Amino acid sequence: MLGPRLPARQHWDLVDNDPRLLKAASDARPSNDISLNTIQFDLNGAFEMMLDRPADIVTTSALLDLVSESWLDRFTRHAAARELSVYAALTYDGRIDLSPADPMDAAMTTAVNAHQRTDKGFGLALGPSGAVAAISMFEALGYLVLQGTSDWEIGTADQGIQIELLQGWANAAREMKSLPDREIDYWLMRRNAAVDRRASTMRVGHVDFVATPSTIR
């Protein structure tokens, strides 16, 4: 999405703590005009040094719902001090819409969202509030923020990812212990049966935003 809007020749520093993700990203390089440098780094540490590298824009993907409020405050303030533009993609916002509907869907979504707010390695996570919190912080720092939804829309043919998501949600709900395990198991059986019949669709809510400092408008 972002790449075609930038100059043909680009350099990206890719930062993650998972070497497998870094290799996958490097292998997927779309053009010889794009150079990549992979950096294995635990973002729970002194990540500010990553923001101090020469950069025109900083991007994140599926991150801001996992971090704590204090981590996000450090990130936004340091980005503002460097006058960096930030593009944040795929921040989960708490919306899960499943079809066909099941009587347990709302309770399961509540349990999943509670789990999203547990510690993911950065302190208590913001979970579904991550995008809203980040946008508010950037705006308070004088940034112009443009936002929009970027929901996952998962169709009947996408059985593999549906099964993986359902199992992950069931596991999360069990960890929260707010619902009887038997009810979670029955919900999972009903939902998987709909997937097997190719009758199941999903919409999982996400938000994208770009935050631009006033100095480069």
Q: How does the language model describe each region?
A:
Residues 24, 29, 123, 199-201, ...:
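Regulatory N- and C-terminal appendages and interdomain linkers associated
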Residues 135, 139-217:
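Conserved Class I S-adenosyl-L-methionine
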Residues 58-59:
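A conserved beta-strand element that flanks and buttresses the S-adenosyl-L-methionine
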Residues 46-48, 64-84, 88-91:
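A short, conserved alpha-helix within the catalytic core of class I
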